[in-house]
């Protein structure tokens, strides 16, 4: 039995509502659906006879709840299309401002790194999951040419990412892997710039630094 006293909670406590679930859904199924977005603190499944099941999932980090909404709202699960949202209307009392349903969260920072060499199936959620090894990521975005951008809450986390996550193995949610490059945005002076691949264009921080090499389990290598 869950200890949640109020099912109406909000974005500040890391809780999300999951509706339109299949009738045979289990808590383990919900864990499998949402574990990639962050550490789950609690799952409460409401499966009452004659009613469409729904659930509440609480993440330890409220920002992971935001990611889960963007990643799973409208997701086709079996014969059902999931409805994933905060238990009440977004109130603006902390957390990320809401962007479009399929876009990244819009909280921004000046502690920014660029990433190249992402595999075609790499999403902004995958990029955030990989780069959060260096610290708290407040924004992540991915372009179609294998480029990405990540912003950290703290300067020291950004600097750690430049030192430790450059030339590391990245894996997408579809299993594609590649070795990515991580470097500072042009014009910054964080002491970690690299020149191995030549200069980047003045106007486009997403200009490629060379052809990425990636492996897909679904196509010949």
UniProtKB/Swiss-Prot annotation:
Keyword Coiled coil among record annotations: no
Annotated segments matching region Disordered: 187-221
Record-linked CDD domains: RRM1_SRSF9, RRM2_SRSF9
Gene3D superfamilies: 3.30.70.330
GO cellular component assignments: nuclear speck
Cross-link position per record: Glycyl lysine isopeptide (Lys-Gly) (interchain with G-Cter in SUMO2): 36
Residues recorded with modification Phosphoserine: 189, 193, 195, 204, 208, 211, 216
Alphabetical keyword list: Isopeptide bond, mRNA processing, mRNA splicing, Nucleus, Phosphoprotein, Repeat, Repressor, RNA-binding, Ubl conjugation
Pfam families per UniProt: RRM_1
Quaternary organization: Interacts with KHDRBS3. Interacts with HABP4. Interacts with NOL3/ARC/NOP30. Interacts with NSEP1/YB-1/YB1. Interacts with SAFB/SAFB1. Interacts with SRSF6/SFRS6. Interacts with TRA2B/SFRS10. Interacts with C1QBP. May also interact with DUSP11/PIR1.
Kinase is among the record's keywords: no
Subcellular localization(s) per the UniProt record: Nucleus
Recorded name of the encoding gene: Srsf9
UniProt name for this protein: Serine/arginine-rich splicing factor 9
Chain segments carrying region Interaction with SAFB1: 188-200
Family: Belongs to the splicing factor SR family.
SMART domains, per database record: RRM (SM00360)
Record GO terms (molecular function): protein domain specific binding; RNA binding
Task of the protein: Plays a role in constitutive splicing and can modulate the selection of alternative splice sites. Represses the splicing of MAPT/Tau exon 10.
Post-translational modification: Extensively phosphorylated on serine residues in the RS domain.
Low complexity compositional bias, start-end: 187-198
GO BP, sorted A to Z: alternative mRNA splicing, via spliceosome; negative regulation of mRNA splicing, via spliceosome; response to alkaloid; response to toxic substance
Phosphotyrosine PTM sites in chain numbering: 214
